[in-house]
């Protein structure tokens, strides 16, 4: 019993030491966060400079840089006592997306029904075959005197 009681008080300082990047109980310093997030944006812009512009829409070309950027914004938000994600950080990240990925919209293919000349046979043929096969089964089941 006593050894457990002795270990508990030592556990709290250890947890506090390990949680140096945890949000502070005093609240979020939004001004500090807005000052620190551009450092992450600049680092990301420098890394994206290594990627050809025409490859910016291919996530596999820069996923490591984007992960580093995301980790940086999370760390900077936590350092100033803010949770992540939060509206200010999301707004900053959205701005980075507009800067680098605004031309990466996916053109969705507008799907249309095929023309009636194609659609009608695609519907009628399976229906007719199903009715014909059901009729054949009924007809054969009535003729039990001969085997196939």
Swiss-Prot record:
Stretches of the chain found on the membrane's Extracellular side: 24-113
TM ranges: 114-138
Any one GO CC term of the record: adrenomedullin receptor complex
Glycan-modified residues: 29, 58, 71, 103
Record-level Gene Ontology MF annotations: adrenomedullin receptor activity; amylin receptor activity; amyloid-beta binding; coreceptor activity
Domain of life: Eukaryota
GO biological process entries: adenylate cyclase-activating G protein-coupled receptor signaling pathway; adrenomedullin receptor signaling pathway; amylin receptor 3 signaling pathway; amylin receptor signaling pathway; calcium ion transport; cellular response to estradiol stimulus; cellular response to hormone stimulus; cross-receptor inhibition within G protein-coupled receptor heterodimer
Cited InterPro entries: RAMP (IPR006985), RAMP_sf (IPR038126)
Marked site positions, Required for CALCRL interaction: 113, 141
Predominant localisation class: membrane
Complex and partners: Heterodimer of CALCRL and RAMP3; interaction induces allosteric modulation of CALCRL function and ligand specificity for adrenomedullin/ADM and intermedin/ADM2. Heterodimer of CALCR and RAMP3; interaction form the receptor complex AMYR3 for amylin/IAPP. Interacts with GPER1.
Task performed by this protein: Accessory protein that interacts with and modulates the function of G-protein coupled receptors including calcitonin gene-related peptide type 1 receptor (CALCRL), calcitonin receptor (CALCR) and G-protein coupled estrogen receptor 1 (GPER1). Required for the transport of CALCRL and GPER1 receptors to the plasma membrane. Plays a role in cardioprotection by reducing cardiac hypertrophy and perivascular fibrosis in a GPER1-dependent manner. Together with CALCRL, form a receptor complex for adrenomedullin/ADM and intermedin/ADM2. Together with CALCR, act as a receptor complex for amylin/IAPP.
Similarity field: Belongs to the RAMP family.
Protein name: Receptor activity-modifying protein 3
Taxonomic classification: Eukaryota, Metazoa, Chordata, Craniata, Vertebrata
């Amino acid at each position: 019993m006593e050894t457990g009681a002795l270990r508990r008080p030592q556990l709290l300082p250890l947890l506090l030491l390990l949680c140096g990047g945890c949000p502070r109980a005093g609240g979020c310093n939004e001004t500090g966060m807005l000052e620190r997030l551009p450092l992450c944006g600049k680092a990301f812009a420098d890394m994206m400079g290594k990627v050809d512009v025409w490859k910016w829409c291919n996530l596999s070309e820069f996923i490591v840089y984007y992960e580093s950027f995301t980790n940086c914004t999370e760390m900077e938000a936590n350092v100033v006592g803010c949770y992540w994600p939060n509206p200010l950080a999301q707004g900053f990240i959205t701005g980075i997306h507009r800067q680098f990925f605004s031309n990466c919209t996916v053109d969705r293919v507008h799907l249309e029904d095929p023309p009636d000349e194609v659609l009608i046979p695609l519907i009628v043929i399976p229906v007719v075959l199903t009715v014909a096969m059901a009729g054949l089964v009924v007809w054969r089941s009535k003729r039990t005197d001969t085997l196939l």
